[in-house]
Design a protein with these regions (language model features):
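Hydrophobic-ligand binding "helix-grip"
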Residues: 46, 51-53, 58-106
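Beta-strand/loop substructures that line and gate deep hydrophobic ligand-binding cavities in soluble
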Residues: 82-139, 145-147
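Sec-exported extracytoplasmic/periplasmic mature domains
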Residues: 22-29, 72-78, 143-154
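Hydrophobic ligand-binding cavity/cleft-lining segments
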Residues: 1-46
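Short, highly charged C-terminal tails/helix-capping segments
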Residues: 42-43, 146-170
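Extracytoplasmic/secreted envelope proteins and their assembly/folding machinery
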Residues: 14, 18-27, 67, 96, ...
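Solvent-exposed, acidic/flexible segments
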Residues: 10, 14, 20, 63-64, ...
Length: 171
């Protein structure tokens, strides 16, 4: 059995961060694994951001075949997922993402995986440093999430340009 988690602090409000991560389709923008196969085929069932939504994929040897399902949402706080891998190995893991306010405009996001390795992969556990391997991949995704959300936050802070009133222009 293993538990792996990583976190990052994002300069954005908690509700905005959660509203982004609860939609699994947004993982296309920040998940390490999505970047491993740009040609990956994706299918979706249900309403994204709601319990029961399933995102499935068929990818290359790096990402394999599987699906993830939203199995729980504590609105604004926690997203629970079940990952079901089909290829190259059949296994099921749980994952979650949480958001915690650090301050009014800062949010700590934690992304964690819990799993169990079955034979023959469990034989490799003493050799494979799952925490480092999977943890580095989680951290890469979180770092990209931070960049995306801070960019969105910055763009929203920009004051809209004031339209020129044509009645006051000199012709």
């Amino acid at each position: 059995d293993y538990h792996i988690e990583r976190n990052v602090t994002i300069d954005a409000q908690k509700d905005k961060v959660f509203d982004y991560i609860k939609y699994l389709k947004n993982q296309d923008n920040y998940s390490f694994w999505n970047k491993q196969d740009p040609e990956m085929t994706k299918n979706y069932t249900g309403n994204d951001g709601e319990v029961g939504f399933v995102s499935s994929w068929v990818g290359n040897d790096k990402v394999g075949t599987g699906e993830q399902e939203i199995i729980g949402i504590k609105e604004g706080d926690r997203l629970d997922l079940e990952l079901r891998f089909k290829k190259p190995y059949k296994m099921s893991n749980s994952a979650y993402m949480t958001t915690d306010a650090v301050s009014e405009n800062q949010t700590k996001v934690t992304w964690a995986f819990d799993g169990k390795m079955n034979y023959p992969m469990n034989v490799m556990m003493p050799i494979i440093n799952m925490d480092k391997m999977l943890g580095d991949q989680l951290q890469a995704g979180l770092n990209d999430l931070k960049i995306i959300l801070e960019k969105i936050q910055t763009e929203k802070r920009v004051e809209p340009s004031v339209p020129v009133d044509s009645a006051n222009t000199i012709n």
